[in-house]
């Protein structure tokens, strides 16, 4: 028997019921005659507090509230990929057919198509013992991704009957099992899972493999591990969304969950348009076939914004349990924190710093701690990597969301508006950014790319830091007073900035660069530095070295050397040797 109650008070998205109405904490409820979706967030003997995930305009005291007896849950089955949902996993395509461009209040649609038939290949037989997470069937969801239908994490038993291979809807029975207590359970392709509860795993692994993004400053200088967490803070116009789009397009994750949380609707439109036209470089299939979008844009109800991150995480953990590597793009966690602040204000809670609730840090940690490289219940290995954009007002990194986020992420890609306004993209400021995964991943780089990879990376960072120190002197008294070896540092740092850190998202070779090419580019830049330093130690001035235009040719490598032609780097070494010899001959 589900609980029933009547509205006693309304305060924006917050609804109050008088007395103890028999509801459970976090229970999903239907509010009012329009049956708006809500969730129980507070219970006392005097009143029940509910947050409503839809617009509450027109609700009146006395209207009924009906419980469902279950928490707010995500529907997990084939059909998630290529779909676009709102914050509580309602399909926007189906809603658009029913109510047009805007979501009507109280509209209900199945999260996934219950009429579409999927071809299921059964992987179990009668009499098999099934444990939690065991794969009972395989369904080709897209050309690149095989959906594995699993036993729910809270169920196990012996197989009593199995359906034949064939076409089934997501609700038709596939396997009947006998549980430990002797009762029978019917398994279909569909599972339900509460969005606020992490799905269980066997064990968690330390970081050991990088999430390769094709962006040089990320992969080489500040790498992110598979199963890791990263924050991209930056002011307005610094390129947070573009950075996340680039990672969503080119990273070597199997599946991308893109959560548009409180940002502009046009950004989601851009993802839909671009991803449908681009092909995955690994499989050759459209990028949209490995992507799911959760759109909770700035004009949608605030309460659903808070739920959208948990919905996306639950979908990601479901695919992780199949053995896939999933990357979540959350754009932006600041808008999510603002939703927490607004709801906290409605609940009349004591505000903390800048009006955010005192539990902001614990909510952020609940979100980021669901990332990780894990061994699943079925023995497979999967990961969830989280990349969260942070939008501090005025680009001030000392505000609470950025500061609390830094506590829970191990990778920090701070965007700089001065770099962005100078048209340097990605606008990641190399002096303030960091990655704590570098030591964990150094063994992987040395084994899979080159033994010198980490050493070269550290030398690049050292040169950039030297440039920063020298620029303070240059700003005061100019560069002419510097000795030639320091002038060379400034020139090589310019080559690193323009030829390595800067990247063109619209160039076919420069938009995504393989690690082998990244290493070769570092090698050439440092080879040029060593040769020039040798010349300067013999008394050659930097002005003579700059006459040959060798620095400009090295900067242009990113365009001139195709990604599939690493052999061309030998020609650049020869050019640098020829440059060295010609300078020696002319000044002998």
PLM feature spans:
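Short, surface-exposed secondary-structure boundary micro-motifs
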Residues: 20, 34, 70-71, 89, ...
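Short histidine-centered loop motifs in beta-beta connectors
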Residues: 52, 57, 119-129, 159-167
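N-terminal accessory targeting/assembly segments
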Residues: 1-104
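C-terminal amphipathic alpha-helical interaction region
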Residues: 539-588
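Short, compositionally biased
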Residues: 42-48, 78-89, 145-165, 185-199
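P-loop NTPase nucleotide-binding/switch module
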Residues: 97-153, 169-229, 243-246, 281-300, ...
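P-loop NTPase catalytic core
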Residues: 220-221, 227-553
